[in-house]
Structure formats: C-alpha cells, structure tokens
C-alpha cells in the first residue's frame, strides 16, 4: 500500500491550537540502555520492548496462511496492507487475508483467500481490490499446484482485480498480464477523470517469453524500440467495467540514466558468502558471481533453468548430468543478463531497467519513484503519461526501495532495502547510512539531500532488518512517520527538521531464533484511523496506539485521530 503513504492536505491545524501543551510535562529521553538490545528469541512469544506506543493486539495468521512446522516458510510471508472502512487486507505470498478492525483489540478474520504468487502487494479503491503477481508459480485460477512449464497459458504475472462489494467473498473480475509481472503497484486517481482509476505497475522479474505473452521483448531499446526495459506499465481501470482493464501505456521513465556505483557488501557478509559458496560447490551446488561476490543460487531458479535445457533438446523427464554440465557452463551469462543489462550505445552501462515502487501525490501532481539505482521525481499531472523531472543517486544506497512525501510535498523520504529484506543489516558493525532512509527537500523540480535516518537500536545477526514501508501520522504542523524495519520492529520518528530526524517511539521483539536467521518482522506499518497497523511477516497482524510522551502530546494524538479514511 505504499501508494497511500502520503496524508492528503487537510485543514486540521486549526483544530489543534493547543497540541503541544502537555508533552513538555512528560519525559523525552529514550531509555538507557536500549531495551531492544538482547531481547529473548521465540516465534509467538518473543520478548518485547515498547516506548511511547502500546501494543493493542497481535493476531496470528489464519490456518491456511501458516506452516506450524516451518516458521520460516517463504511461501507464507505476510506482505503489504490495504484498508477500506473497518477492514484491513493483508497480502501474503499465499494469497490475502481480510481482517475486521471494528475492535482493534480483537481483529476478526473475514476471509482467507488462497491465491499463491508473490508478493500479493495489495491496494483498494472503493469496491475494487488490486493484487500484484510476479512469481512464476502464480496461476490465473489461483490454484496451488503452481506452473511447472517455462511457458504456460496458465501463468499470471501482472495485476489481479477483485470486486469486494461483498468483502467476505471477493470475486476475481479481471487479470491484466504484464511482461515483467507486478512486484508492486500504485493506484492513481486523475482529478479530471472520475470514470477511471489508473495503476502504475512496477515489475522486477525478467521479461517473459513472447511465446507466453505476445509482444514482450527483452532487447535493448536501440535494438527494439518496443523493449520492455526502462519502463513501467500504466493500466486503466474503468470503475463501471473493471473487467475491461487494460495496459494503456508503457512510459519509459528510466530511459537515459546511466549506471551508478553502490558500496560493497560488509566484510563479514563477503566472507560468509564465500564460505557458503565453497560449501555449495563441494556438494555439487550452483553458484554465480553477482556484484563481485559469489552467491549460491536457489533450487527454484536452478530447477527452472534445467527444465529449460531439457525442453530445448526436446527431452522429457529429469535433467541429466549432461544438462547440469551445460547449465554450469552457461550459468554466469544467464545471471549477468538478469543482474546487469547489456551496455547501451558507446559501451555506456545503463541505469536500472525497472522501478521497485512508486508513491503518488495526485493533489500536487508529483510521484516519487524508487527504482533500484535511483530515486526519481515524476510529474503526474498527466496521470496516463508520467514524466521524469529529476533523479538522484547515492553510493550509500544499495537499492532504492520506496518513497514517502511529507504532507505539503516539500520533502520526500526514500528507503534503501540493502540486502533485499531477508538479511541482517542493522548489526552494530553496519554503517548508519547503509540500509537507511534518505531525506530530501523538494523545490522547483529539484531534490536536495538533507540527512539519513536509520533505526538506532542494533539488531543481531539473526534478525533481518533494513528500512521498509511506512506512512505519515497526521499530526498538524509536523512530519511524523511510522515505519517497519522487519525484525527491527517499528520506529516512529520526527523529520520535521529534515536535517535532524529523531526517533520518538518504537516497538520491537526478539529474534525468531537465537541460533539462525529466520525471516520475520514488520513488512509495513501504517497509521489508519487512530491506530498503527503492522503486517508481521511470520507472526500475523499487530495493532498499536501512540501514548502521550515528551515528544507527542495527547492533544496531538487526538488531532491525528480526527483524520478518518473510508
């Protein structure tokens, strides 16, 4: 739901003339030592630490969305959130769950809709629910057997559209296929077009075969002007006839950018990767070099490549030793094509070929694009044809992941998902500007860097932790944000002064396991109608409320609760 991370401009300041009146009577200093350090590990009953927030409820996943025997099962990762009325829709790599939040202290399950295919990033507009599909196992019919064939008419990569007029019984009314699938998407409204909504699709998968989806091309633009590279898709959805949704255009918002260097991995990660690669090779595993480090390739990726080799020789059955040898010979080239696009004219390495996520602010005609190697500022006054007006890069950023505007659009915050989200990147040895937020001021089509913000509490090597999704809290006259940091928990911070962001509240749990990294933590934390709602990857759904402190008064909290979304 990153597209909804902005708070619409509302005239609420006048309702809160005394907002700051009581906070000075309460302590403002954070507890020392930090209670987040050294928390006891466990799955459902890990030790907890909270400061200036109260945990209202924790609701475990429904039975269809949990593997009791394997808490780290990636097939059941809880992902992003979307809201409508009293309901929250929680995406999951296995589908989505709808929870009734009428009683925040006890959310109740409305429906568990099984539909495998990551990430199931979700958004809602009135009675329509949109879900992103990118994984090769996603099927049009949402069944669970996957798609074993390399090319298949049964595969879904793109956007699923559901009618949730009866929210207990979502009805799939349309699927829009795209060439790179949909890792995330953003719903955009056009003030001049009330008959339609638009979806900006960010796909990060390799380009599909044209044998599976006609017209898909992975060639560079100088070889094929209709290349899918360096573009996003814009889908138009008729509100009266969503079944007619279609790709309207493919603006090349990344064209013309050149590759930028990022920092190397941390020394301990380089050493660990080398050790793991050596062990894998000794056991017959498959490895490849990515950004200077040898990595072990997963069985799913290897299996798909071997299947392709078998089919290319018109064979059947299991891959042979000859097939494995052929893959070893070709593997580095295959990985290079995925990770490093070929050089453009003149041998210049191009910049990123896709965006990860786009956050829109239609009221001011701007969007923030987080696009791997760059952060973009987009002009979206013409919603159907967004245009890049500024781009920033930073060698401290490994992967530009998401963006959040402040309320008046004078600032934008970008996150860096260094390590991809399932690695420990908040260790005491990790630099504070790596895997952090970068805050920029915005003026006259220019973004100017101001500072970094990173979760200040060090986490263990067994906790995946890095900057992830969050939203503004609508406190008048201030820029306050809540953000998920995976197993770093949630952090609430004040970035009203963009050069000096300050943490003012937090919640954290101990790791899932005290001996190894098991993925978990807050995928996203959003303010919604007076509460903070967090999607916990492995533990379910958390609901919090702010408590008055030396940083936020009760009057300010009450003013924020006056902002109500439907």
Placement of each model-derived feature along the sequence:
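Bacterial N-terminal signal peptides
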Residues: 8-18
């Amino acid at each position: 739901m990153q597209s909804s991370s902005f708070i619409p401009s509302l005239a609420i300041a006048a309702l809160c003339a005394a907002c700051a009146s009581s906070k000075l009577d309460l302590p403002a200093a954070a507890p020392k030592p930090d209670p987040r350090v050294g928390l006891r590990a466990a799955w459902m009953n890990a030790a907890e630490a909270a400061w200036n927030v109260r945990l209202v409820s924790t609701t475990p996943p429904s039975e269809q969305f949990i593997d009791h025997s394997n808490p780290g099962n990636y097939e059941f990762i809880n992902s992003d959130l979307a809201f409508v009325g009293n309901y929250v829709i929680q995406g999951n790599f296995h589908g989505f769950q709808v929870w009734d939040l009428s009683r925040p202290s006890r959310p109740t399950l409305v429906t568990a809709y099984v539909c495998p295919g990551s990430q199931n990033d979700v958004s809602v507009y009135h009675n329509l629910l949109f879900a992103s599909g990118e994984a090769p196992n996603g099927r049009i019919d949402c069944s669970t057997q996957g798609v074993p064939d390399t090319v298949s008419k049964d595969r879904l990569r793109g956007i699923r559209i559901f009618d949730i007029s009866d929210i207990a019984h979502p009805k799939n009314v349309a699927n829009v296929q795209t060439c790179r699938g949909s890792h995330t998407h953003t719903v955009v409204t056009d003030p001049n077009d009330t008959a339609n909504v638009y979806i900006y699709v960010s796909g990060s998968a390799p380009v599909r075969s044209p044998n599976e989806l006609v017209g898909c091309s992975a060639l560079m633009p100088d070889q094929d002007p209709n290349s899918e590279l360096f573009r996003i898709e814009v889908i138009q959805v008729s509100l009266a006839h969503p079944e007619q949704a279609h790709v309207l255009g493919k603006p090349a918002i990344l064209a013309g950018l050149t590759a930028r260097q990022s920092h190397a991995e941390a020394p301990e990660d380089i050493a660990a990767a080398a050790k793991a690669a050596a062990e894998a090779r000794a056991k017959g595993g498959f490895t490849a070099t990515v950004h200077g480090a040898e990595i072990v390739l997963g069985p799913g990726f290897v299996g798909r490549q071997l299947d392709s080799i078998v089919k290319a020789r018109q064979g059947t059955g299991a891959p042979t030793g000859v097939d494995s040898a052929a893959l070893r010979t070709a593997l580095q080239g295959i990985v290079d094509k995925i990770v490093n696009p070929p050089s453009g004219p003149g041998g210049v390495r191009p910049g990123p070929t896709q965006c990860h996520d786009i956050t829109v602010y239609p009221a001011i005609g701007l969007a923030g694009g987080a696009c791997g190697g760059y952060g973009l500022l987009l002009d979206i006054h013409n919603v159907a044809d967004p245009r890049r007006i500024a781009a920033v890069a930073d060698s401290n950023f490994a992967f530009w992941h998401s963006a959040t505007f402040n309320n008046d659009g004078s600032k934008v915050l970008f996150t860096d998902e260094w390590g991809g989200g399932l690695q420990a990147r908040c260790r005491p040895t990790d630099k504070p500007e790596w895997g952090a937020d970068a805050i920029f001021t915005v003026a006259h089509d220019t973004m100017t860097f101001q500072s970094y913000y990173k979760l200040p509490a060090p986490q263990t090597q067994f906790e995946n932790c890095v900057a992830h999704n969050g939203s503004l809290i609508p406190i008048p006259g201030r820029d306050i944000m809540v953000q998920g940091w995976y197993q770093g928990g949630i952090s609430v911070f004040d970035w009203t002064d963009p050069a000096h962001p300050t943490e003012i509240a937090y919640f954290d749990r101990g790791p899932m396991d005290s001996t190894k990294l098991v993925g978990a933590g807050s995928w996203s934390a959003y303010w919604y109608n007076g509460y903070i709602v967090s999607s916990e990857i492995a533990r379910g759904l958390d609901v919090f409320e702010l408590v008055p402190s030396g940083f936020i008064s009760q009057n300010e909290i009450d003013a924020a609760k006056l902002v109500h979304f439907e």
